[in-house]
């Protein structure tokens, strides 16, 4: 019995060493040519509750996002969030909110998207724009490809990613990164680079589609 307990303790310890990184508060700034900027902040708001938020300005759009989440056995548990995206000065808007509630044994996402309101039952963990990368840093750095649940506009979708290690020049120095590329069937693209060190910072983000291409870099 003692051996079994010791094995479980060692197994959990080494799993944590392999799959987890230290989640610490931060304030990061990203820029995009010619005048784009993003401020992203991670705050610890209670013993096991975190808030990640970002505010971005670009000639094509402005975006404000916030997510509240906790961590359970190396998994991000998204509790609530919102996104306010205004394109071309408000010509197109994407405003949405979501919150996880319990109804008996069920977990429900209560959401609003524009004028639409609704709720759906959830059975698995899911992520939004901000928590997706945190979960990937915790569990998917060693996987060459994977699928992950993503919540957007009242629906849970499945995103597929490829992951490979690359060496790039960043701030005039060679840096090893994990390069994550979303697999899509349309003409949009999304890719981000995570530095392979203890902090696991996202140092570059590439996104685009019909009529726009935006590259962000950590200042």
What are these regions (language model features)?
Residues 6, 11, 47, 102-106, ...:
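Intrinsically disordered, low-complexity segments enriched in glycine/proline and serine/threonine
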Residues 4, 135-137, 174, 202:
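Generic hydrophobic, helix-prone segments enriched in Leu/Val/Ile
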Residues 10-12, 130-138, 159, 197:
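Intrinsically disordered, low-complexity segments enriched in Ser/Pro/Gly/Ala and basic residues
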């Amino acid at each position: 019995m003692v051996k079994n307990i010791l094995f479980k303790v060692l197994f959990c310890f080494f799993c944590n060493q392999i799959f987890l990184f230290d989640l610490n508060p931060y304030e990061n700034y990203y820029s995009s040519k010619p005048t784009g900027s993003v401020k992203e902040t991670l705050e610890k708001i209670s013993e096991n509750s975190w808030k990640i938020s970002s505010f971005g300005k670009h000639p094509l759009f402005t975006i404000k996002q916030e997510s509240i989440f906790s961590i359970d056995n190396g998994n991000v548990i998204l509790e609530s969030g919102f996104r306010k995206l205004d394109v071309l000065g408000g010509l197109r808007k994407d405003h949405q909110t979501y919150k996880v509630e319990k109804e008996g044994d069920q977990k429900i996402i209560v959401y609003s998207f524009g004028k639409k309101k609704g709720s759906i039952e959830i059975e698995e963990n899911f992520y939004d724009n901000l928590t997706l990368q945190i979960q990937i840093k915790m569990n998917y750095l060693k996987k060459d490809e994977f699928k992950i649940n993503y919540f957007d506009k009242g629906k849970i979708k499945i995103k597929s990613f490829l992951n490979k290690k690359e060496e790039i020049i960043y701030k005039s120095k060679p840096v090893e990164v994990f390069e994550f590329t979303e697999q899509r069937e349309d003409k949009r693209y999304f890719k981000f680079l995570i530095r392979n060190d203890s902090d696991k910072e996202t140092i570059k983000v590439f996104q685009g589609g019909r009529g726009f291409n935006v590259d962000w870099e950590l200042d």
